[in-house]
Amino acid sequence: VETQPQESPDAAPKPEAQSAEPKSIFDLMTGGSISYEADLAAYYLNEMTAAAAEGDVEAGRSAEEKRNAVIDASAAEPDPGKISFDDLYLLSKVICYEAGSDWLTDEFRICVGEVIMNRVASPEYPDSIHDVIYQKGQYSCVNTARFAGLVPTEECVDAALRLLCGERRMVPSVVFQSNDLQGEPFTMYTDRRLGTTYFCLSENQELYPID
């Protein structure tokens, strides 16, 4: 998979990608804190990711509940933060459906999921992962039998977890992913089997101020 930024000679300068460095698995699990409570929260987060990769919703929700109880009862600094198992599982499934093939890169998987996260944060789209994915006319994969029975791979669960923990590769205004251009492209990926996938910017750049 090759990354090929697209430039239009007459277009206004595009925003630069955010410099969100990939976190280590320890940081993802504990928030960087070293304590009994952080270790326990990390244990339950690991249980959540394992459940997602096995398609075990009941176990995942149970692990989330236990992890939240640990976080609520502790004062670990920094706060490892709560993560919804349903968000993790649903995001993982969409990433797996769109980019689950084993020859695709982790970066591509992150970008696929990042479009969803950008939409959640955008004033142009619904404000939850569920509502973004199930918005009419958007992610049609959710209405298929394949999606209903899909169990995400560990790689896709890992990509979803990193996104939920704040990792980013693009800019907040990248809200389109398609095999056809849907606005000004921020970047694109070319694969001999899948063809070209474009990640495009919203037409309403004024809604996405750059810090």
Identify the function of each model-found stretch:
Residues E65-D211:
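Bacterial extracytoplasmic/cell-wall-associated proteins, especially those involved in peptidoglycan
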